[in-house]
From Swiss-Prot:
Sites where the protein binds L-methionine: E56, Q99, D239, K270
Gene designation per UniProt: metK
Protein name: S-adenosylmethionine synthase
Top-level enzyme category: transferase
HAMAP family per UniProt: S_AdoMet_synth1 (MF_00086)
Pathway membership: Amino-acid biosynthesis; S-adenosyl-L-methionine biosynthesis; S-adenosyl-L-methionine from L-methionine: step 1/1
Function summary: Catalyzes the formation of S-adenosylmethionine (AdoMet) from methionine and ATP. The overall synthetic reaction is composed of two sequential steps, AdoMet formation and the subsequent tripolyphosphate hydrolysis which occurs prior to release of AdoMet from the enzyme.
GO cellular component: cytoplasm
Cofactor names: Mg(2+); K(+)
Keyword Ligase: no
EC code: 2.5.1.6
Assembly mode: Homotetramer; dimer of dimers.
Compartments reported by the entry: Cytoplasm
Main localization (coarse): cytoplasm
Length: 382
């Protein structure tokens, strides 16, 4: 048993990197809506007054990429020229090419069971019993803070809030269990006229306290609100944004390993996305069944080959079974070939934009099929 502190961060939908992720997934969604078999690897770069969309896309449908980009930027909240970045007047440049035929030959024109992996890849999935969503507590609560900030901004409850924001939550663990929140860092972009003391009070009383469990807050919990003292200039005016630069925010907040591949902008034949969802699905059902308190799954693939190269389950000594026995159960009951993952998790009919902010895992929306606990009986019978 260990005693330690652990920190995870989240960022808002108005953070530059998250703008890029959401645009990439908005393009993906628009293509899959009309062409479920479209091949998409869409990357986005945002900076002051400019959005550049590039990548490899093969589809039989037409997508007005410029309009998709502008609509998404407005939806996020950059709809005022005074913010320095505005969906109505920023430049939008598109540089799209077709998917390489060398890659396509491994995944196209194959029956569902024989669709090969689009690249060599290793992915990880994780679950633990720290929260009701079976996610690590630090990232779970960091995401909730960002959701609350966006809600108060969009509902005009705190009219001085602006889209860019970040949160960071540190929890103290005893015997591997979270017992108290040690500190909360929250930085939010704001109107230039709001006073710092009013901002700090509002963030603590309207964002932090209604969001975080009272039993985890205590008199010594530290609140660090806009520590630099001013955060007026934000979004792409302050920092460039790129698709795939928040992969730890997107996954488990650093509590679990990461294979390195990002998720957003990729159709489900890209196994760094679809197989990572599958790995989470397996890990969550293992923990949800009560078989283990913590579980991390690794799956690896070779390009053009359907079946995984390797599968490994690590339960950190919290399972009734050995890691070898758990891995054997997984390979017996879960089909991890790309085509079967796509079919079983309904990955051709998703709204991927929903995943592009506030994390890909631990969500309650029915759209997140990899969060279902419909395989727990496999492990409960052990």
């Amino acid at each position: 048993m260990e005693n330690f502190v652990f920190t995870s961060e989240s960022v808002s939908e108005g953070h530059p990197d998250k703008i890029a992720d959401q645009i990439s997934d908005a393009v993906l969604d628009e293509i899959l809506k009309h062409d479920p078999n479209g091949r998409v690897a869409c990357e986005t770069f945002v900076t002051t007054g400019l959005v550049l969309v590039g990548g490899e896309i093969t589809t039989n449908t037409y997508v007005d990429i410029e309009q998709v980009v502008r609509n998404k930027i407005h939806e996020i909240g950059y709809n005022n020229p005074s913010y320095g970045f505005d969906g109505s007047c920023c430049a939008v440049i598109s540089s799209i090419v077709k998917q390489s035929p060398d890659i396509a030959m491994g995944i196209d024109n194959a029956n569902e069971e024989e669709i090969g992996a689009g690249d060599q890849e290793m992915v990880f999935g994780y679950a633990c019993n720290e929260t009701k969503s079976l996610m690590p507590a630090p990232i779970y609560y960091a995401h909730l803070l960002m959701k609350r900030q966006a809600y108060l901004r969009k509902q005009n409850i705190l009219s001085w809030l602006r889209p860019d924001a970040k949160s960071q939550v540190t929890l103290r663990y005893e015997n591997n269990k979270p017992i108290v929140i040690d500190s909360v860092v929250l930085s939010t972009q704001h109107h230039p006229e709001i006073q710092q003391k009013d901002l700090i009070e509002a963030v603590i009383e309207e964002i932090i306290k209604p969001t975080l469990p009272t039993h985890l807050l205590h008199k010594d919990t530290k609140y660090l609100i806009n520590p630099t003292g001013r955060f007026v200039i934000g979004g792409p005016v302050a920092d460039c944004g790129l698709t795939g630069r928040k992969i730890i925010v997107d996954s488990y907040g650093g509590m679990a390993k990461h294979g390195g591949g990002c998720f957003s902008g990729k159709d489900p034949t890209k196994i760094d996305r679809s197989a990572a969802y599958m790995a989470r699905y397996i890990a969550k059902n293992i923990v949800g069944s009560g078989l283990a308190d913590r579980c991390e799954i690794q799956i690896s693939y070779a390009i053009g080959v359907a079946s995984p190269v390797s599968v490994y389950a690590e339960t950190f000594g919290t399972s009734k079974l050995s890691n070898e026995q758990t891995t054997k159960l997984i390979t017996e009951h879960f089909d991890m070939r790309p085509g079967k993952i796509i079919k079983n998790l309904k990955l051709h009919t998703q709204c991927y934009q929903k995943t592009a902010s506030y994390g890909h895992f631990g969500r309650e929306d029915e759209n997140f099929t990899w969060e279902q606990l419909d395989k727990v009986d496999i492990f409960k019978s052990i």
